[in-house]
């Protein structure tokens, strides 16, 4: 495949920046919630393939406070990009879902076949439903137009070039930023919730490698989950961040704040059936790299 014809939406973000090839679009190039801008940039670039990473994302607080915005912006971005890709003759498209698309009340582990088996968790249902529609749109386009469009479902992605904003970033980068400020200001490190919820994290460079594999090799109707299938508590994540940052102060657990979904373990059997020898970055190594990147790039980091 001609890598010069690869286009990456959200190309300056967490996953997009980790992908080593292709033309990378950011929100400064086009507002993908607007059809005319989306169609215009795709006609201009004329890609053979698209890796669609662009999305409105955030942590628990943002998902609770901006439900309407999260739903509208993600519905529009995804619908516009996939339809414009079809009209512009894009041969292969990879779209990103999220594990939040899965039902809250479901038998674990999560598998690719369970996406639409019930309602998502109440804390982020607008975002989750918007992301579910990516799966529906891709299936419909495959059936009607015969397009080789696929979707992938990474667990909680983290790494360099993440959004480290404390109010609207995801949990791990927001915690890194909080810990950095606590260390620099000699204050307590305050963390929402009890620390008990369990999450699966995957390093952005691992996601990039897997996405490049999907671009060349994966053509199925059903999405594929990217996960290590290893759960870790938020409390243990905080411990790894504290160690990597060299923070020696007090961690203050704000148990009056919401924890979000308690756990959502996922199954990587499908991924392992294709790539049995894939080596994931251990989370202590990934967190250390992420902390080092944030400290070294504090002035330019998204925060």
Q: Which positions does each model-derived feature cover?
A:
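Conserved Rossmann-fold NAD(P)-dependent oxidoreductase catalytic core, especially the SDR/UDP-sugar
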Residues: 79-124
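C-terminal substrate-binding subdomain of Rossmann-fold SDR/epimerase-dehydratase oxidoreductases
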Residues: 14, 20, 181-303
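Short-chain dehydrogenase/reductase
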Residues: 71, 75, 119, 123-135, ...
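N-terminal Rossmann NAD(P)H-binding glycine-rich loop of SDR-like oxidoreductase domains
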Residues: 3-21
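NAD(P)H-binding glycine-rich loop region in Rossmannoid oxidoreductase-like domains
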Residues: 32, 36-74, 87
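Flexible, glycine-rich beta-alpha linker
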Residues: 31, 101-103, 126, 150-174, ...
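Conserved catalytic-site region of short-chain dehydrogenase/reductase
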Residues: 60, 95-111, 126-132, 144, ...
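Active-site Tyr-X1-5-Lys
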Residues: 80, 122-155, 174-185
């Amino acid at each position: 495949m001609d890598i010069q014809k690869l286009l990456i939406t959200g190309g300056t973000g967490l996953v997009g920046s980790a992908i080593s090839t292709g033309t990378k679009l950011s929100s400064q190039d086009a507002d993908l919630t607007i059809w005319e801008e989306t169609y215009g940039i795709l006609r201009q670039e004329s890609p053979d393939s698209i890796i669609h990473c662009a999305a409105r994302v955030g942590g628990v607080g943002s998902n609770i406070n901006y439900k309407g915005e999260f739903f509208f912006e993600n519905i529009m971005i995804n619908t516009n990009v996939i339809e414009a890709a079809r009209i512009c003759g894009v041969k292969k498209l990879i779209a990103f879902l999220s594990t939040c698309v899965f039902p809250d009340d479901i038998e674990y582990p999560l598998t690719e076949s369970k996406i639409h088996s019930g309602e998502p968790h109440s804390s982020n249902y607008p975002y989750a439903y918007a992301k579910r529609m990516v799966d529906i749109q891709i299936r419909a386009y495959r059936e009607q137009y015969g397009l080789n469009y696929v979707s992938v479902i990474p667990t909680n992605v983290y790494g360099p070039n993440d959004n480290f904003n404390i109010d609207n970033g995801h949990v791990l980068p927001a915690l890194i930023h909080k810990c950095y400020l606590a260390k620099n200001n000699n204050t307590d490190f305050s963390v929402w919730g009890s620390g008990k919820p369990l999450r699966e994290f995957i390093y952005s460079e691992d996601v990039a490698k897997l996405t490049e594999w999907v671009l060349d090799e994966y053509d199925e109707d059903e999405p594929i989950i990217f996960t290590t299938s290893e759960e870790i508590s938020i409390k243990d994540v905080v411990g790894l961040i504290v160690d990597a940052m060299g923070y020696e102060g007090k961690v203050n657990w704000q148990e009056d704040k919401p924890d979000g979904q308690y756990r959502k373990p996922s199954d990587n059997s499908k991924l392992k059936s294709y790539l049995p020898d894939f080596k994931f970055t251990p989370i202590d190594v990934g967190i250390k790299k992420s902390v080092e990147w944030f400290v070294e790039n504090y002035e330019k980091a998204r925060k």
